[in-house]
């Protein structure tokens, strides 16, 4: 399970889209996996009439315009994904859906707004996820030199990798 963290406009959504595509397509060393993508605001897949306009991978099922919490539950029940990807966790109902994802055997790939791990830990939702050691890694993006730059990668305990 991986959480991408950055302030708005630093490349979380773009990096998430690229990761989804690469996980879905696979490569010569790693086989592709089925990915369930909840695209609540249409920023990831950019669907038009139900067809993704952005490349999110050949094994990716997209729920477009669906609330994150509902979408995660729907994907688990009906699409059998190996990986569930969502953008911008933050609401209490997202937390309950995240619990379902992690307890059903799926891998979670998500993003959250914040400047640092400490920043998002001010929210009880993320405090609980960290205490449960849900995320194996936290990837912090920033604006140093350019948007989308990886500033830090932390393990599930918040220690540098």
Describe the predicted segments one by one.
Residues 24-75:
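P-loop NTPase switch/communication element
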Residues 5-8, 61-65, 86-88:
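Glycine- and other small-residue-rich loops at beta-strand/loop junctions that grip anionic moieties
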Residues 79-138, 143:
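Conserved P-loop NTPase nucleotide-binding/switch module
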């Amino acid at each position: 399970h991986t959480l991408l963290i950055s302030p708005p406009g630093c490349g979380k959504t773009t990096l998430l889209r690229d990761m989804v595509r690469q996980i879905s397509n696979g490569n010569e060393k790693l086989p592709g996996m089925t990915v369930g993508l909840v695209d609540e605001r249409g920023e990831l897949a950019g669907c038009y009439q139900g067809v993704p306009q952005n490349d999110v991978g050949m094994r990716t099922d997209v729920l477009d315009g669906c609330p994150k919490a509902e979408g995660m539950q729907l994907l688990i029940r009906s699409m059998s994904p190996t990986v569930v990807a969502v953008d911008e966790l933050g609401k209490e109902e997202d937390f309950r859906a995240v619990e379902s994802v992690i307890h059903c055997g799926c891998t979670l790939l998500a993003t959250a707004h914040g400047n640092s791990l400490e920043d998002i830990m001010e929210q009880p939702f993320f405090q609980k996820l960290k205490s449960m050691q849900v995320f194996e890694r936290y990837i912090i993006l920033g604006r140093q030199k350019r948007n989308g730059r990886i500033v830090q990668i932390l393990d599930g305990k918040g220690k540098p990798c």
